[in-house]
Amino acid sequence: MSSPAATATAAAAEGGRPGRVRARQRLIEACVSALHLYGPSRTTVSRVVSIAGLSPGIVRFYFNSKAALLVAALGFLADEFEERVLKPVAALKHSPVAALGLLVELYLDPEIASPRKVSVWYSFWGEASSRQEYLDICGQKDEDFARLVHELTETLIEQTGARHLDADGVALGLIGVLEVLWQGIAFQSEASLNRRALVARALAYLRSVFPGQFPGPAAPRRRTR
């Protein structure tokens, strides 16, 4: 009698392109989970297939090595970030207030910024100095994000006439705020996170730089004697 893992392997191998795509994605998702639990150096093929519920033999259909599987997992995260964050925000670039508000929401969304995925991003960054593939993918993601944030802040400065502001400094400040919030997410569980509070903290920075441009709690009224 075949095991469930062996049955899944056979189905993936014989199920045509849709089945192969699903099995490959299943391995990548399992690899992300393994990286979250064990880090790159302790993630093994056996741990990945165990999480995926597949047999070890299936890996050779899609990846010629553990290294190739890890690069595919990082590439998946980078593609997801581009599709779910960069592209929707860039589509609103002529409305920088709406675009920056959406950027904050999406950057801190649990689909992108789950403790699992954020911790994996940091794991890869930790290994990037010794792995050119990791450095290339992580670096490109950060460059694209920084370029978009700078473009949006520059446009907003022009539209509001706040020419005393420096676009580089404002963009760097927002990126820094979001980075600090991601660092906090990496070391917490989803149940302990207050997503609304995280978004509010990032928007508070934008309100402090561009008063009246971003919705938020009204300023407390000054008490009169």
Kindly label every feature range from the protein language model.
Residues 1-22, 214-225:
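N-terminal intrinsically disordered/low-complexity leader segments
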Residues 26, 30-68, 72:
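Helix-turn-helix
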Residues 26, 30-37, 84-88, 120, ...:
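Solvent-exposed, amphipathic alpha-helical segments
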Residues 72, 86-117, 164-174, 218-225:
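Hydrophobic alpha-helical connector segments
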Residues 75-81:
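Short, basic, alpha-helical segments at the C-terminal edge of helix-turn-helix-like DNA-binding modules
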Residues 92, 125-129, 185-189:
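Secondary-structure edge/capping motif, primarily at the C-terminal ends of alpha-helices
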Residues 98-99, 113-136:
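Amphipathic alpha-helical segments used for helix-helix packing
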